Protein backbone atom coordinates (compact mmCIF):
# COMPACT_ATOMS: atom_id res chain seq x y z
CA UNK A 1 0.00 0.00 0.00
CA UNK A 2 1.30 3.44 -0.95
CA UNK A 3 2.09 5.80 1.89
CA UNK A 4 0.20 9.10 1.99
CA UNK A 5 3.20 11.20 1.15
CA UNK A 6 2.58 14.61 -0.47
CA UNK A 7 3.70 14.78 -4.09
CA UNK A 8 5.81 17.87 -4.77
CA UNK A 9 5.35 19.18 -8.28
CA UNK A 10 6.45 22.77 -7.91
CA UNK A 11 9.92 23.59 -6.69
CA UNK A 12 9.94 24.25 -2.94
CA UNK A 13 11.00 27.85 -3.17
CA UNK A 14 7.99 28.91 -5.24
CA UNK A 15 4.84 30.32 -3.72
CA UNK A 16 1.48 29.47 -5.22
CA UNK A 17 -1.84 31.18 -4.66
CA UNK A 18 -5.00 30.14 -6.42
CA UNK A 19 -8.77 30.57 -6.65
CA UNK A 20 -10.72 33.33 -4.91
CA UNK A 21 -7.68 34.48 -2.97
CA UNK A 22 -5.88 35.45 -6.18
CA UNK A 23 -8.88 37.23 -7.64
CA UNK A 24 -9.48 39.32 -4.54
CA UNK A 25 -5.72 40.00 -4.32
CA UNK A 26 -5.67 41.23 -7.92
CA UNK A 27 -8.72 43.40 -7.39
CA UNK A 28 -7.23 44.93 -4.23
CA UNK A 29 -3.94 45.63 -6.00
CA UNK A 30 -5.77 47.37 -8.85
CA UNK A 31 -7.87 49.37 -6.37
CA UNK A 32 -4.73 50.45 -4.50
CA UNK A 33 -3.12 51.76 -7.69
CA UNK A 34 -6.37 53.55 -8.60
CA UNK A 35 -6.50 55.15 -5.13
CA UNK A 36 -2.97 56.54 -5.51
CA UNK A 37 -3.95 58.26 -8.76
CA UNK A 38 -7.51 59.27 -7.82
CA UNK A 39 -6.65 62.73 -6.49
CA UNK A 40 -4.86 63.60 -9.76
CA UNK A 41 -8.05 63.89 -11.83
CA UNK A 42 -9.54 67.19 -12.93
CA UNK A 43 -8.61 70.87 -12.65
CA UNK A 44 -8.47 70.77 -8.84
CA UNK A 45 -6.07 67.84 -8.86
CA UNK A 46 -3.29 67.44 -6.34
CA UNK A 47 0.36 66.97 -7.28
CA UNK A 48 2.52 64.06 -6.15
CA UNK A 49 6.15 64.42 -5.15
CA UNK A 50 8.26 61.36 -5.82
CA UNK A 51 11.87 60.63 -5.00
CA UNK A 52 13.57 58.29 -7.41
CA UNK A 53 16.30 55.87 -6.23
CA UNK A 54 19.00 58.26 -7.46
CA UNK A 55 17.66 61.05 -5.25
CA UNK A 56 16.06 63.05 -8.08
CA UNK A 57 12.69 64.69 -7.46
CA UNK A 58 9.65 64.33 -9.71
CA UNK A 59 6.68 66.60 -9.06
CA UNK A 60 3.68 65.85 -11.23
CA UNK A 61 -0.01 65.08 -11.48
CA UNK A 62 0.36 63.09 -14.70
CA UNK A 63 -0.91 59.56 -14.03
CA UNK A 64 1.67 57.90 -16.23
CA UNK A 65 4.63 59.84 -14.81
CA UNK A 66 3.62 58.93 -11.23
CA UNK A 67 3.22 55.22 -11.90
CA UNK A 68 6.49 55.11 -13.84
CA UNK A 69 8.37 56.23 -10.73
CA UNK A 70 6.58 53.95 -8.23
CA UNK A 71 8.18 50.55 -7.69
CA UNK A 72 5.42 47.97 -7.70
CA UNK A 73 5.68 44.39 -6.51
CA UNK A 74 2.29 42.81 -7.17
CA UNK A 75 1.93 41.41 -10.70
CA UNK A 76 -1.63 42.74 -11.10
CA UNK A 77 -0.49 46.19 -10.05
CA UNK A 78 2.31 45.95 -12.62
CA UNK A 79 -0.20 45.36 -15.38
CA UNK A 80 -2.14 48.44 -14.17
CA UNK A 81 1.03 50.51 -14.49
CA UNK A 82 1.50 49.04 -17.95
CA UNK A 83 -1.95 50.16 -19.18
CA UNK A 84 -1.27 53.75 -18.22
CA UNK A 85 1.90 53.57 -20.34
CA UNK A 86 -0.04 52.09 -23.25
CA UNK A 87 -2.61 54.87 -22.99
CA UNK A 88 0.15 57.47 -22.98
CA UNK A 89 1.83 55.98 -26.06
CA UNK A 90 -1.39 55.48 -28.01
CA UNK A 91 -3.26 58.74 -27.44
CA UNK A 92 -1.10 60.70 -24.99
CA UNK A 93 -3.95 61.69 -22.67
CA UNK A 94 -6.43 60.05 -20.30
CA UNK A 95 -3.74 58.15 -18.36
CA UNK A 96 -5.33 59.03 -15.01
CA UNK A 97 -8.91 58.22 -16.08
CA UNK A 98 -7.96 54.83 -17.49
CA UNK A 99 -6.42 53.68 -14.20
CA UNK A 100 -9.36 54.96 -12.10
CA UNK A 101 -11.85 53.36 -14.47
CA UNK A 102 -10.06 49.99 -14.62
CA UNK A 103 -9.80 49.96 -10.80
CA UNK A 104 -13.51 50.68 -10.47
CA UNK A 105 -14.49 48.03 -13.06
CA UNK A 106 -12.65 45.43 -10.97
CA UNK A 107 -14.06 46.82 -7.76
CA UNK A 108 -17.69 46.34 -8.88
CA UNK A 109 -16.88 42.82 -10.12
CA UNK A 110 -15.73 41.74 -6.64
CA UNK A 111 -19.32 41.68 -5.37
CA UNK A 112 -20.34 39.12 -8.04
CA UNK A 113 -17.33 36.91 -7.40
CA UNK A 114 -18.26 36.84 -3.69
CA UNK A 115 -21.71 35.61 -4.70
CA UNK A 116 -19.96 32.71 -6.48
CA UNK A 117 -20.77 34.03 -9.98
CA UNK A 118 -18.32 32.58 -12.48
CA UNK A 119 -15.73 35.09 -13.81
CA UNK A 120 -16.59 34.06 -17.40
CA UNK A 121 -20.16 35.35 -16.94
CA UNK A 122 -18.86 38.68 -15.65
CA UNK A 123 -16.36 38.87 -18.51
CA UNK A 124 -18.94 38.26 -21.23
CA UNK A 125 -21.20 40.95 -19.68
CA UNK A 126 -18.25 43.36 -19.66
CA UNK A 127 -17.51 42.61 -23.31
CA UNK A 128 -21.14 43.30 -24.28
CA UNK A 129 -21.09 46.49 -22.26
CA UNK A 130 -17.90 47.63 -24.01
CA UNK A 131 -19.50 47.28 -27.46
CA UNK A 132 -22.50 49.31 -26.30
CA UNK A 133 -20.24 51.92 -24.67
CA UNK A 134 -18.39 52.41 -27.95
CA UNK A 135 -21.58 52.76 -30.00
CA UNK A 136 -23.10 55.21 -27.47
CA UNK A 137 -19.93 57.31 -27.48
CA UNK A 138 -20.00 57.51 -31.27
CA UNK A 139 -23.66 58.56 -31.09
CA UNK A 140 -23.02 61.49 -28.73
CA UNK A 141 -19.84 62.62 -30.52
CA UNK A 142 -19.89 65.73 -32.70
CA UNK A 143 -17.67 66.56 -35.70
CA UNK A 144 -15.26 69.49 -35.45
CA UNK A 145 -13.82 71.84 -38.06
CA UNK A 146 -10.05 71.50 -37.66
CA UNK A 147 -9.44 74.79 -39.46
CA UNK A 148 -11.33 76.72 -36.77
CA UNK A 149 -8.39 77.65 -34.55
CA UNK A 150 -10.60 79.02 -31.71
CA UNK A 151 -12.34 75.68 -31.39
CA UNK A 152 -8.99 73.83 -31.54
CA UNK A 153 -7.54 76.07 -28.80
CA UNK A 154 -10.64 75.39 -26.73
CA UNK A 155 -10.16 71.62 -27.01
CA UNK A 156 -6.46 71.83 -26.08
CA UNK A 157 -7.40 74.12 -23.20
CA UNK A 158 -9.73 71.42 -21.80
CA UNK A 159 -6.71 69.13 -21.55
CA UNK A 160 -4.42 71.79 -20.09
CA UNK A 161 -6.80 73.05 -17.35
CA UNK A 162 -6.15 69.89 -15.33
CA UNK A 163 -2.38 70.41 -15.43
CA UNK A 164 0.17 72.53 -13.59
CA UNK A 165 0.62 74.67 -16.71
CA UNK A 166 -3.02 75.91 -16.54
CA UNK A 167 -1.86 79.38 -15.41
CA UNK A 168 -0.24 79.88 -18.80
CA UNK A 169 -2.97 78.05 -20.69
CA UNK A 170 -3.29 80.44 -23.65
CA UNK A 171 0.49 80.39 -24.24
CA UNK A 172 0.63 76.59 -23.94
CA UNK A 173 -2.37 76.08 -26.24
CA UNK A 174 -0.86 78.27 -28.94
CA UNK A 175 2.52 76.56 -28.64
CA UNK A 176 0.92 73.10 -28.93
CA UNK A 177 -1.27 74.05 -31.89
CA UNK A 178 1.56 75.77 -33.80
CA UNK A 179 3.96 72.88 -33.20
CA UNK A 180 1.53 70.18 -34.32
CA UNK A 181 0.42 72.11 -37.41
CA UNK A 182 4.06 72.64 -38.32
CA UNK A 183 5.00 68.95 -38.21
CA UNK A 184 1.82 67.84 -39.97
CA UNK A 185 2.74 66.16 -43.23
CA UNK A 186 0.30 65.09 -45.94
CA UNK A 187 1.23 62.66 -48.65
CA UNK A 188 -1.09 60.85 -51.09
CA UNK A 189 -4.07 61.85 -48.96
CA UNK A 190 -2.50 60.30 -45.84
CA UNK A 191 -1.88 62.48 -42.80
CA UNK A 192 1.21 61.91 -40.74
CA UNK A 193 1.88 63.77 -37.50
CA UNK A 194 4.99 62.50 -35.76
CA UNK A 195 5.42 64.66 -32.66
CA UNK A 196 8.03 62.46 -31.00
CA UNK A 197 10.43 62.64 -33.91
CA UNK A 198 10.00 66.12 -35.31
CA UNK A 199 8.74 68.37 -32.49
CA UNK A 200 11.58 68.48 -30.01
CA UNK A 201 11.22 70.16 -26.64
CA UNK A 202 14.40 71.92 -25.46
CA UNK A 203 14.40 72.86 -21.78
CA UNK A 204 16.72 75.67 -20.72
CA UNK A 205 16.51 76.69 -17.04
CA UNK A 206 16.40 80.44 -16.54
CA UNK A 207 14.09 83.21 -17.69
CA UNK A 208 10.33 82.92 -17.19
CA UNK A 209 7.74 80.56 -18.65
CA UNK A 210 6.31 83.42 -20.77
CA UNK A 211 9.62 83.42 -22.72
CA UNK A 212 8.82 79.96 -24.12
CA UNK A 213 8.11 79.82 -27.84
CA UNK A 214 7.97 77.62 -30.94
CA UNK A 215 10.89 78.05 -33.33
CA UNK A 216 10.18 77.67 -37.04
CA UNK A 217 13.19 75.44 -37.39
CA UNK A 218 15.70 73.66 -35.20
CA UNK A 219 17.89 74.52 -32.26
CA UNK A 220 20.86 72.38 -31.22
CA UNK A 221 23.21 72.61 -28.28
CA UNK A 222 26.37 73.07 -30.37
CA UNK A 223 28.92 75.75 -31.24
CA UNK A 224 31.01 76.18 -34.41
CA UNK A 225 34.21 74.12 -34.51
CA UNK A 226 36.60 76.99 -35.34
CA UNK A 227 36.53 80.39 -33.62
CA UNK A 228 36.95 82.29 -36.91
CA UNK A 229 33.91 80.78 -38.59
CA UNK A 230 30.80 82.91 -39.18
CA UNK A 231 28.14 82.85 -36.46
CA UNK A 232 25.35 84.74 -38.21
CA UNK A 233 24.34 83.77 -41.76
CA UNK A 234 21.21 84.86 -43.61
CA UNK A 235 19.62 82.40 -46.06
CA UNK A 236 22.35 79.78 -45.50
CA UNK A 237 22.98 76.91 -47.91
CA UNK A 238 23.20 73.87 -45.62
CA UNK A 239 24.95 70.55 -46.30
CA UNK A 240 24.20 67.64 -43.95
CA UNK A 241 26.58 64.69 -43.64
CA UNK A 242 26.63 61.53 -41.60
CA UNK A 243 30.28 60.76 -42.33
CA UNK A 244 33.38 62.17 -40.71
CA UNK A 245 35.74 64.67 -42.31
CA UNK A 246 38.79 62.92 -40.92
CA UNK A 247 41.37 60.56 -42.33
CA UNK A 248 39.81 57.14 -42.66
CA UNK A 249 41.45 54.62 -40.40
CA UNK A 250 41.46 50.96 -41.41
CA UNK A 251 38.49 48.93 -40.21
CA UNK A 252 40.70 46.38 -38.47
CA UNK A 253 44.17 46.94 -37.10
CA UNK A 254 46.45 48.04 -39.94
CA UNK A 255 50.24 47.70 -39.95
CA UNK A 256 52.45 49.50 -42.43
CA UNK A 257 56.13 48.72 -42.74
CA UNK A 258 58.23 51.71 -43.77
CA UNK A 259 61.86 51.41 -44.82
CA UNK A 260 62.58 54.91 -46.05
CA UNK A 261 62.02 58.29 -44.47
CA UNK A 262 60.34 59.70 -47.62
CA UNK A 263 57.67 56.99 -47.39
CA UNK A 264 56.64 58.31 -44.00
CA UNK A 265 56.31 61.82 -45.42
CA UNK A 266 54.33 60.38 -48.33
CA UNK A 267 51.87 58.69 -45.97
CA UNK A 268 51.25 61.95 -44.14
CA UNK A 269 50.87 63.68 -47.49
CA UNK A 270 48.29 61.09 -48.60
CA UNK A 271 46.29 61.71 -45.43
CA UNK A 272 46.30 65.44 -46.13
CA UNK A 273 45.36 64.93 -49.78
CA UNK A 274 42.46 62.69 -48.77
CA UNK A 275 41.06 65.30 -46.39
CA UNK A 276 41.65 68.06 -48.95
CA UNK A 277 39.73 66.04 -51.53
CA UNK A 278 36.80 65.57 -49.11
CA UNK A 279 36.69 69.30 -48.42
CA UNK A 280 36.92 70.21 -52.11
CA UNK A 281 33.95 67.96 -52.89
CA UNK A 282 31.98 69.97 -50.36
CA UNK A 283 33.38 73.42 -51.28
CA UNK A 284 32.48 73.11 -54.97
CA UNK A 285 28.77 73.28 -54.02
CA UNK A 286 29.43 76.63 -52.28
CA UNK A 287 27.56 75.85 -49.04
CA UNK A 288 27.58 78.26 -46.07
CA UNK A 289 27.19 75.60 -43.40
CA UNK A 290 28.34 71.98 -43.07
CA UNK A 291 26.74 69.92 -40.30
CA UNK A 292 27.96 66.39 -39.65
CA UNK A 293 27.06 63.65 -37.16
CA UNK A 294 30.72 62.60 -36.85
CA UNK A 295 34.02 64.41 -36.28
CA UNK A 296 35.83 67.09 -38.31
CA UNK A 297 39.64 67.06 -38.17
CA UNK A 298 41.67 70.23 -37.60
CA UNK A 299 42.89 70.19 -41.18
CA UNK A 300 39.35 69.92 -42.56
CA UNK A 301 38.31 72.82 -40.30
CA UNK A 302 41.15 74.86 -41.76
CA UNK A 303 40.09 74.19 -45.38
CA UNK A 304 36.43 74.91 -44.63
CA UNK A 305 37.28 78.08 -42.72
CA UNK A 306 39.37 79.32 -45.67
CA UNK A 307 36.36 78.78 -47.93
CA UNK A 308 34.25 80.82 -45.46
CA UNK A 309 32.14 77.78 -44.50
CA UNK A 310 30.81 77.33 -40.97
CA UNK A 311 31.13 73.76 -39.66
CA UNK A 312 29.27 72.06 -36.79
CA UNK A 313 30.23 68.53 -35.74
CA UNK A 314 28.92 65.61 -33.68
CA UNK A 315 25.24 66.49 -34.04
CA UNK A 316 22.76 63.85 -32.87
CA UNK A 317 21.17 61.74 -35.61
CA UNK A 318 17.68 62.80 -34.52
CA UNK A 319 18.67 66.49 -34.67
CA UNK A 320 20.17 65.97 -38.12
CA UNK A 321 16.89 64.43 -39.33
CA UNK A 322 14.98 67.42 -37.96
CA UNK A 323 17.32 69.89 -39.68
CA UNK A 324 16.83 67.97 -42.95
CA UNK A 325 13.03 68.23 -42.60
CA UNK A 326 13.19 71.91 -41.63
CA UNK A 327 15.44 73.25 -44.40
CA UNK A 328 14.79 70.69 -47.14
CA UNK A 329 18.31 69.24 -47.22
CA UNK A 330 19.20 65.59 -47.74
CA UNK A 331 21.60 63.77 -45.43
CA UNK A 332 24.55 62.44 -47.45
CA UNK A 333 26.89 59.62 -46.44
CA UNK A 334 29.80 60.35 -48.78
CA UNK A 335 30.94 63.88 -49.60
CA UNK A 336 31.95 62.84 -53.15
CA UNK A 337 28.31 61.99 -53.89
CA UNK A 338 27.02 65.47 -52.99
CA UNK A 339 24.74 67.05 -55.60
CA UNK A 340 23.08 70.44 -55.85
CA UNK A 341 19.64 69.15 -54.80
CA UNK A 342 21.08 67.73 -51.56
CA UNK A 343 21.77 71.29 -50.35
CA UNK A 344 19.14 72.72 -48.01
CA UNK A 345 18.10 76.26 -48.90
CA UNK A 346 14.86 76.48 -46.91
CA UNK A 347 16.30 78.13 -43.78
CA UNK A 348 16.14 81.91 -43.41
CA UNK A 349 18.78 82.38 -40.72
CA UNK A 350 21.54 80.53 -38.92
CA UNK A 351 22.87 82.13 -35.77
CA UNK A 352 24.72 81.04 -32.69
CA UNK A 353 23.56 82.48 -29.37
CA UNK A 354 24.84 82.07 -25.86
CA UNK A 355 22.16 81.22 -23.29
CA UNK A 356 23.47 80.94 -19.75
CA UNK A 357 26.87 79.26 -20.04
CA UNK A 358 26.18 77.30 -23.20
CA UNK A 359 26.18 78.01 -26.91
CA UNK A 360 23.18 77.08 -29.04
CA UNK A 361 22.88 77.00 -32.82
CA UNK A 362 19.55 78.26 -34.15
CA UNK A 363 18.43 77.39 -37.68
CA UNK A 364 15.22 79.38 -37.95
CA UNK A 365 12.80 81.29 -40.22
CA UNK A 366 12.42 78.22 -42.41
CA UNK A 367 10.12 78.65 -45.42
CA UNK A 368 8.11 75.46 -45.02
CA UNK A 369 9.41 73.64 -41.95
CA UNK A 370 8.17 70.13 -41.34
CA UNK A 371 10.04 70.04 -38.02
CA UNK A 372 10.15 72.46 -35.13
CA UNK A 373 11.71 73.03 -31.73
CA UNK A 374 9.79 74.14 -28.67
CA UNK A 375 11.98 76.27 -26.47
CA UNK A 376 10.92 76.13 -22.82
CA UNK A 377 12.23 78.54 -20.20
CA UNK A 378 11.45 78.38 -16.49
CA UNK A 379 12.75 78.70 -12.98
CA UNK A 380 13.93 75.16 -12.23
CA UNK A 381 14.47 71.75 -13.83
CA UNK A 382 11.51 70.21 -11.98
CA UNK A 383 9.10 72.90 -13.21
CA UNK A 384 10.43 72.56 -16.75
CA UNK A 385 9.99 68.78 -16.71
CA UNK A 386 6.38 69.13 -15.58
CA UNK A 387 5.67 71.82 -18.19
CA UNK A 388 7.17 69.54 -20.85
CA UNK A 389 4.95 66.64 -19.77
CA UNK A 390 1.88 68.90 -19.90
CA UNK A 391 2.84 70.23 -23.33
CA UNK A 392 3.32 66.70 -24.67
CA UNK A 393 -0.23 65.90 -23.53
CA UNK A 394 -1.57 69.06 -25.18
CA UNK A 395 0.19 68.23 -28.46
CA UNK A 396 -1.13 64.68 -28.38
CA UNK A 397 -4.69 65.98 -27.89
CA UNK A 398 -4.22 68.32 -30.84
CA UNK A 399 -2.83 65.47 -32.95
CA UNK A 400 -5.74 63.19 -32.05
CA UNK A 401 -8.27 65.82 -33.14
CA UNK A 402 -6.44 66.50 -36.42
CA UNK A 403 -6.34 62.78 -37.24
CA UNK A 404 -9.90 62.05 -36.07
CA UNK A 405 -11.97 65.26 -35.83
CA UNK A 406 -14.68 63.93 -33.50
CA UNK A 407 -15.37 65.29 -30.01
CA UNK A 408 -17.28 64.16 -26.93
CA UNK A 409 -18.22 66.35 -23.95
CA UNK A 410 -15.76 66.34 -21.01
CA UNK A 411 -16.31 66.86 -17.29
CA UNK A 412 -17.78 63.39 -16.75
CA UNK A 413 -20.68 64.12 -19.14
CA UNK A 414 -19.79 61.33 -21.60
CA UNK A 415 -19.45 58.83 -18.75
CA UNK A 416 -22.88 59.75 -17.36
CA UNK A 417 -24.48 59.62 -20.83
CA UNK A 418 -22.96 56.19 -21.52
CA UNK A 419 -23.90 54.96 -18.01
CA UNK A 420 -27.50 56.08 -18.55
CA UNK A 421 -27.64 54.32 -21.94
CA UNK A 422 -26.28 51.09 -20.40
CA UNK A 423 -28.74 51.21 -17.49
CA UNK A 424 -31.66 51.64 -19.90
CA UNK A 425 -30.42 48.78 -22.06
CA UNK A 426 -29.92 46.44 -19.09
CA UNK A 427 -33.64 46.69 -18.25
CA UNK A 428 -34.43 44.74 -21.42
CA UNK A 429 -31.87 42.04 -20.60
CA UNK A 430 -32.72 38.76 -18.95
CA UNK A 431 -30.60 36.21 -17.17
CA UNK A 432 -27.71 36.57 -14.80
CA UNK A 433 -25.59 38.69 -17.16
CA UNK A 434 -27.70 41.81 -16.62
CA UNK A 435 -26.19 42.45 -13.16
CA UNK A 436 -22.53 42.74 -14.15
CA UNK A 437 -23.71 44.67 -17.25
CA UNK A 438 -25.47 47.18 -15.02
CA UNK A 439 -22.42 47.30 -12.76
CA UNK A 440 -20.35 48.68 -15.66
CA UNK A 441 -22.74 51.64 -15.79
CA UNK A 442 -22.21 52.10 -12.06
CA UNK A 443 -18.41 51.91 -12.52
CA UNK A 444 -18.46 54.66 -15.16
CA UNK A 445 -19.88 57.08 -12.60
CA UNK A 446 -16.51 57.01 -10.82
CA UNK A 447 -15.18 59.75 -13.14
CA UNK A 448 -17.81 62.43 -12.30
CA UNK A 449 -17.75 61.26 -8.66
CA UNK A 450 -13.98 61.73 -8.42
CA UNK A 451 -14.25 65.16 -10.08
CA UNK A 452 -16.81 66.20 -7.46
CA UNK A 453 -14.69 64.77 -4.61
CA UNK A 454 -11.56 66.56 -5.82
CA UNK A 455 -13.22 69.96 -5.59
CA UNK A 456 -14.65 69.18 -2.18
CA UNK A 457 -18.34 69.36 -3.12
CA UNK A 458 -21.14 67.09 -1.89
CA UNK A 459 -20.79 63.86 -3.87
CA UNK A 460 -24.15 62.18 -3.22
CA UNK A 461 -26.29 65.26 -3.84
CA UNK A 462 -24.56 66.28 -7.05
CA UNK A 463 -24.36 62.76 -8.51
CA UNK A 464 -28.06 62.18 -7.89
CA UNK A 465 -28.99 65.45 -9.62
CA UNK A 466 -26.63 64.62 -12.51
CA UNK A 467 -28.24 61.19 -12.90
CA UNK A 468 -31.67 62.81 -12.94
CA UNK A 469 -30.49 65.38 -15.50
CA UNK A 470 -29.29 62.66 -17.88
CA UNK A 471 -32.71 60.98 -17.87
CA UNK A 472 -34.12 64.09 -19.59
CA UNK A 473 -34.05 64.66 -23.35
CA UNK A 474 -30.99 66.36 -24.96
CA UNK A 475 -29.08 66.59 -21.71
CA UNK A 476 -26.18 64.27 -22.52
CA UNK A 477 -23.71 67.17 -22.45
CA UNK A 478 -24.32 67.95 -18.77
CA UNK A 479 -21.38 67.24 -16.50
CA UNK A 480 -19.41 68.52 -13.52
CA UNK A 481 -17.54 71.80 -13.56
CA UNK A 482 -14.24 70.66 -12.06
CA UNK A 483 -13.35 74.18 -10.87
CA UNK A 484 -16.48 74.92 -8.81
CA UNK A 485 -18.04 71.49 -8.33
CA UNK A 486 -21.39 72.52 -9.85
CA UNK A 487 -23.41 70.94 -12.66
CA UNK A 488 -23.12 72.70 -16.01
CA UNK A 489 -23.73 72.11 -19.69
CA UNK A 490 -20.34 71.30 -21.22
CA UNK A 491 -21.44 72.87 -24.52
CA UNK A 492 -21.61 76.27 -22.81
CA UNK A 493 -18.46 75.72 -20.75
CA UNK A 494 -16.57 74.56 -23.86
CA UNK A 495 -15.00 71.45 -22.32
CA UNK A 496 -14.50 68.86 -25.06
CA UNK A 497 -12.34 65.78 -25.37
CA UNK A 498 -11.23 63.92 -28.51
CA UNK A 499 -13.31 60.83 -29.22
CA UNK A 500 -10.12 58.82 -29.88
CA UNK A 501 -8.93 59.37 -26.28
CA UNK A 502 -12.26 58.34 -24.77
CA UNK A 503 -12.55 55.23 -26.94
CA UNK A 504 -9.04 54.14 -26.04
CA UNK A 505 -9.71 54.81 -22.32
CA UNK A 506 -12.82 52.62 -22.27
CA UNK A 507 -11.29 49.84 -24.34
CA UNK A 508 -8.12 49.69 -22.24
CA UNK A 509 -9.99 49.86 -18.91
CA UNK A 510 -12.44 47.07 -19.78
CA UNK A 511 -9.77 44.88 -21.40
CA UNK A 512 -7.59 45.18 -18.29
CA UNK A 513 -10.48 44.34 -15.98
CA UNK A 514 -11.26 41.29 -18.13
CA UNK A 515 -7.61 40.23 -18.19
CA UNK A 516 -7.24 40.42 -14.39
CA UNK A 517 -10.56 38.64 -13.74
CA UNK A 518 -9.34 35.75 -15.87
CA UNK A 519 -6.37 35.03 -13.62
CA UNK A 520 -7.00 32.34 -11.01
CA UNK A 521 -3.48 31.27 -10.17
CA UNK A 522 -0.27 33.12 -9.38
CA UNK A 523 2.99 31.23 -9.02
CA UNK A 524 5.82 33.42 -7.81
CA UNK A 525 9.37 32.16 -7.92
CA UNK A 526 11.44 33.37 -4.97
CA UNK A 527 15.07 34.29 -5.41
CA UNK A 528 17.80 32.22 -3.83
CA UNK A 529 19.04 33.57 -0.54
CA UNK A 530 22.52 34.46 -1.78
CA UNK A 531 20.99 36.32 -4.69
CA UNK A 532 18.69 38.17 -2.34
CA UNK A 533 21.56 39.45 -0.21
CA UNK A 534 23.41 40.86 -3.21
CA UNK A 535 20.39 42.66 -4.61
CA UNK A 536 18.54 43.74 -1.52
CA UNK A 537 15.49 45.85 -2.10
CA UNK A 538 14.72 44.35 -5.53
CA UNK A 539 11.13 43.13 -5.95
CA UNK A 540 10.79 39.36 -6.35
CA UNK A 541 10.04 38.29 -9.88
CA UNK A 542 6.47 37.18 -10.19
CA UNK A 543 5.29 35.06 -13.08
CA UNK A 544 1.63 34.81 -14.00
CA UNK A 545 -0.09 31.65 -15.02
Curated annotation (Swiss-Prot):
Disulfide pairings: 366-372
Quaternary context: Component of the chaperonin-containing T-complex (TRiC), a hexadecamer composed of two identical back-to-back stacked rings enclosing a protein folding chamber. Each ring is made up of eight different subunits: TCP1/CCT1, CCT2, CCT3, CCT4, CCT5, CCT6A/CCT6, CCT7, CCT8. Interacts with PACRG. Interacts with DNAAF4. Interacts with DLEC1.
Binding site for ATP: 42, 94-96, 411, 482, 497
PTM sites of type Phosphotyrosine: 247
Cross-link for Glycyl lysine isopeptide (Lys-Gly) (interchain with G-Cter in SUMO2), residue positions: 15, 248-249, 381
Residue list for modification Phosphothreonine: 430, 459
InterPro entries in UniProt: Chap_CCT_gamma (IPR012719), Chaperone_TCP-1 (IPR017998), Chaperonin_TCP-1_CS (IPR002194), Cpn60/GroEL/TCP-1 (IPR002423), GroEL-like_apical_dom_sf (IPR027409), GROEL-like_equatorial_sf (IPR027413), TCP-1-like_intermed_sf (IPR027410), TCP-1_chaperonin (IPR053374)
Enzyme Commission code(s) on record: 3.6.1.-
Catalytic activity: ATP + H2O = ADP + phosphate + H(+)
One Pfam family hit: Cpn60_TCP1
N-acetylmethionine PTM sites in chain numbering: 1
Name assigned to this protein: T-complex protein 1 subunit gamma
Lineage top rank: taxon: Eukaryota
GO molecular function: ATP binding; ATP hydrolysis activity; ATP-dependent protein folding chaperone; unfolded protein binding
Amino acids binding ADP: 42, 94-97, 162-163, 411, 482-483, 497, 502
Any GO CC annotation of this UniProt entry: chaperonin-containing T-complex
Family from the record: Belongs to the TCP-1 chaperonin family.
Underlying gene: CCT3
PROSITE patterns: TCP1_1, TCP1_2, TCP1_3
Binding sites annotated in the UniProt record for Mg(2+): 93
